[in-house]
Structures are given as structure tokens and as C-alpha cells.
Amino acid sequence: MNKLIFILLFLVSCSNPKFDLPKMKEGSQYPRLASTQNGGLLMSWFEKIDSVNWSLNWSEFQNKKWSISKTISSSRAYFVNWADFPSIYHIGGDSIAAHWLERSGAGTYDYDIKVVTSYNRGESWSSPQTPHNDGTLGEHGFLSFFNDMNNDLGMIW
């Protein structure tokens, strides 16, 4: 799947046709693309709401256009950085998962992974869950989603 996204981005960057992005507020950061099982794309990104609050938004590209962006979550506790940023993942059918990092303590690298799921194509989202329970405050991140052998959502970090 990652090869498909890379090839798609390469082909789009080498072609003349314009490929519009979803409507995002100025200053939006850290977009991430994921393919869907029916050949579409999902994109998630951070939008700054004010001086301390951010929202995690998403949009879907299908039938040659992007859907109106919707908010997955908003918080002032996000751990926002250039190296490890939120993702969105198409589990299958109308099921989607997303993740972000959230501060868990006062230390520079005290953060946890938060995961949400939607079973109605992003109309509503579950409460955020932390997929690890090792009891440490720091450096949980770089999560990757996958479908396991039963086609259920899997995660590794």
C-alpha cells in the first residue's frame, strides 16, 4: 500500500494536470495521505484554531474531488512535531481509524498515542483510546495501522 501511495504521488508530481488539495485553513500542517480499498484517498492534517488549540481534520478524495473537511478531534494537549504526526486509515467499508499524539506529562517527550475509530465514514468518532499500557509517560509514537489476518484493525508502534 505504501508503494502505491508513493507511486501515486510520484505520478501526480510528474504530470501536468492540477491536483487540488482539500480546502484547509491557512497555516494547516502535517498532512498525511492514505489510500482506500476502492481507489480513493483519505487525508488528515492539523489546523490551528487559536494560539493554543488545534484540530485534527480529514477529507476524502473520490470521484475526482475532495469532500468537505470534517473535524476528528480538537485539543490543546496535542503533541505536535515535524517527525511524527497524525494518520488516518481505511479499515474497510465505512470503517476508518485515526491516531494522534497527546501530551501525558510535563517532560519534553511525555506523550501517548490516541486512537479513534469511525464506523460511519467519519460522521462520528469513538472516544480516544490509548493502545498501550506500559505505564511510562514518554515516547510512544510512529504508529502504523494495518489490517490483520481477520481483516481487523491492527497497530504497531
Protein language model annotation of sequence segments:
Residues 1-2, 64:
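Generic cytosolic/nucleocytoplasmic N-terminal low-complexity/intrinsically disordered segments
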Residues 3-13:
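Sec-dependent N-terminal signal peptides
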Residues 14-157:
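Extracellular, repeat-based ectodomains that mediate carbohydrate processing or recognition
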